[in-house]
Amino acid sequence: MLTGNEIREKFIEFFMQKQHKHFESASLIPDDPTLLLTVAGMVPFKPYFLGQKEAPCPRVTTYQKCIRTNDLENVGRTARHHTFFEMLGNFSFGNYFKKEAIKWSWEFVTEVLKINKDKLWVTVFTTDDEAEKIWIEECNFPKERIVRMGESENWWSAGPTGSCGPCSEIHVDLGIQYGGDENSKIGDEGTDNRFIEIWNLVFTEWNRMEDGSLEPLPKKNIDTGAGLERIAAVVQGKTNNFETDLLFPILEEAGKITGSQYGKNPETNFSLKVITDHARAVTFLVNDGVIPSNEGRGYILRRILRRAVRHGRLLGYKDLFMYKMVDKVVEKFEIAYPDLRKNVENIRKIVKIEEEKFSNTLDQGIQLVNQEIDNLLTNGKNKLDGEISFKLYDTYGFPYELTEEIAEERGVIVLREEFEAKMEEQKEKARSAREVVMEKGQDSFIEEFYDKYGVTEFTGYEKTEDEGKLLSLREAKDRKYLLIFDKTPFYAESGGQVGDQGKIYSDNFAGKVLDVQKQKDIFIHTVKLEKGMPEENKTYKLEVDVVKRLDTAKNHTATHLLHKALREIVGTHVQQAGSLVDSEKLRFDFSHYEALTEEQLSKIEDIVNKKIREGIEVVVSHHSIEEAKKLGAMMLFGDKYGDVVRVVDVHGFSTELCGGTHIDNIGKIGLFKITSEGGIAAGVRRIEAKTGYGAYLVEKEEADILKNIEQKLKATNSNLVEKVEKNLETLKDTEKELEILKQKLALFETKAAISGMEEIGGVKVLIAAFKDKSTEDLRTMIDTIKDNNEKAIIVLASTQDKLAFAVGVTKTLTDKIKAGDLVKKLAEITGGKGGGRPDFAQAGGKDEGKLLDAFKEVREIIEAKLV
């Protein structure tokens, strides 16, 4: 019996013997900006199939890690649904075609995997006579086990137009015990669990035109995908993927941690399978650099992880456990994916932090969902308002899918449309709140300008002064104008770097450039007029503020050094999440799960400053995207790059794709100083820093503060720490003494209060106000008085910071008078709110002027109850 690892190895070996080149699995974060995650084995090769790029070699084979969450709710319920899965694939880019693809798949399935030929079935596209003929003549496959299927099952296309073609699928018949009878075939009703697809062969041979007609492609391609989990189940004689050697050790670990037994009942099986699948998905996602967040791929990770945590609760396990599952996943998959072992500690940390966050709100979220469902069912309804599911998501971080799953378990429908409407409403508010850079109607103007003149020629990499012909002049606000020239040395804001500033002038005109933006590579200069009025079709001198440009360039190059240093000290999971570079400072947002320590920040500063002192040359070059990748250039996932990219290289340290302006030698940065580090969103941190003279000023300010402290403490630099520690120790002793005095004073005041208590109906009553008591002080007084009196009612107020009340009633009297009732009356009269238990309650008030009225009314209530 072959193991999962052996199946992988044999697949790659088989196709390498057929002259295929083995490509390592690509990241789950694809280069394709249209995709959040790698969802199929062909995703890394999409540009070659679409003809956007030339393939590096004609034949390729891979095992590719993939993630799909479109049917997340089915994961755990069925034997074969997964979020994470592996696709074995062989690909041809204009090389071999149907005959070889079919013959080799048959050879591998029957001779290498040794699957019983009599159990195999094949599907082909309705009109694909060629594929059927190859199966029959080349593989000696029986025609009666070939089923022709329509476009929805056996046709692949990249979209409504473009590359497309028929498919042929290999299925395994598990037997009539899984549906149908001896005459059943693929596609018959009730046979979904009987005929299991294990391999899909896609023959990309057509180009669909706008009118729907098909034209033959000049180069025909092969794209195949075989699900490793399904193949392992068939080869190992399992009807459930979770019982294969790929997943069962992880499932056993889930049972061991949660104290649950697989096979005990369907509910336990369901939850254990969810945890097993999701532990694998979470481990691989975090390993590839995904951080939990509320959007994009980070939200997909969060949904998967939180669903698993909930299923731990369903098994009765309330402690953290998902981070512990990481070890078993790594142990199982590190042979095929060795980087898992290198990153295991980082993965555990990120998973644990996210699990801790959610555990704090999970029970509350589940309780709220169930309360809402109880209310519905009590009133004979079964539809949950979308506003409720949105509130759970927005306020408590409770994923919509969990609300939906809990509701479904109780027979309630969640109104998804209402939830999505609330989400869209929130997004619209966010969109409206953003600053609009271009005025209304500007977009259509840009389109017209582009059609007429094309793009602006940018000369700013080579020079900071140039002449440009004014092609367009549009009035903005406050004597500002938007100017577009045929060419410009002014850098337009992009890639986090702000636009250049400077001046534009001629003999009879002068204007100050405040900002430069671009749309469709058309550079739009925002100019404040200082003299005269510019005219279209005239040539003007364009001059960049070189001091600001140089300072901005220093900060931009320093940002690259910071990025690299972060990855060295914090971990390679660090990815850029945003940046801002101007002449005064730099700001860098990055993916990370916790605050950086002072030690880490110090090391990062040291690395950057050490590099600056080395005075390394900064080299800018242009390469194809493939060449840039070979150079190890860092690039932003999700960004769309052209065929030729600009590479900024600090030799031996940092290599990044970047379109910004940089200094030619990092020694010119002078000094690098981090000024702040903090969180800006879940899983995203921000560092702000200064360079050069700005960094010197920060250092000087800190030195001046230190000098001032030394003078005040009469200390020197060498004994300052010792002096501060001594003063802190003295302060601590003084605070202890003060606390003892306060306790003595409180005891004295309490005794005085007790001696002054009046008696109403045989009950000791104290109603008093204090100016310098905290709510905790009031509570202590009440407890002391109650301890010394069998029957007592204490009503206290404090006006220390704001009006506050505390009321105590001995338990011998709570059947007659409740502290909560008295405190509510006090709060009501003074315009506040409060409540509590029958024996103790607290409240806040707003109107101190009503305090005596409140005391008077409470006294009357007490007298009425006791006399």
UniProtKB/Swiss-Prot annotation:
Cofactor note: Binds 1 zinc ion per subunit.
Cellular component terms (Gene Ontology): cytosol
Predominant subcellular localization, coarse grouping: cytoplasm
InterPro entries the record matches: aa-tRNA-synth_II/BPL/LPL, Ala-tRNA-lgiase_IIc, Ala-tRNA-ligase_IIc_anticod-bd, Ala-tRNA-synth_IIc_core, Ala-tRNA-synth_IIc_N, Ala-tRNA_ligase, Ala_tRNA_ligase_euk/bac, DHHA1_dom
Catalytic activity reported: tRNA(Ala) + L-alanine + ATP = L-alanyl-tRNA(Ala) + AMP + diphosphate
Metal-binding as UniProt keyword: yes
GO BP terms: alanyl-tRNA aminoacylation
Names of required cofactors: Zn(2+)
Enzyme class: ligase
EC numbers on record: 6.1.1.7
Compartments, as annotated in UniProt: Cytoplasm
Recorded superkingdom: Bacteria
Binding site for Zn(2+): H556, H560, C658, H662
Gene Ontology MF: a single term: aminoacyl-tRNA deacylase activity
Pfam families the record matches: DHHA1, tRNA-synt_2c, tRNA_SAD
Keywords of the record: Aminoacyl-tRNA synthetase, ATP-binding, Cytoplasm, Ligase, Metal-binding, Nucleotide-binding, Protein biosynthesis, RNA-binding, tRNA-binding, Zinc
Domain notes: Consists of three domains; the N-terminal catalytic domain, the editing domain and the C-terminal C-Ala domain. The editing domain removes incorrectly charged amino acids, while the C-Ala domain, along with tRNA(Ala), serves as a bridge to cooperatively bring together the editing and aminoacylation centers thus stimulating deacylation of misacylated tRNAs.
Family of the protein in this entry: Belongs to the class-II aminoacyl-tRNA synthetase family.
Function: Catalyzes the attachment of alanine to tRNA(Ala) in a two-step reaction: alanine is first activated by ATP to form Ala-AMP and then transferred to the acceptor end of tRNA(Ala). Also edits incorrectly charged Ser-tRNA(Ala) and Gly-tRNA(Ala) via its editing domain.
Identification of the protein by name: Alanine--tRNA ligase
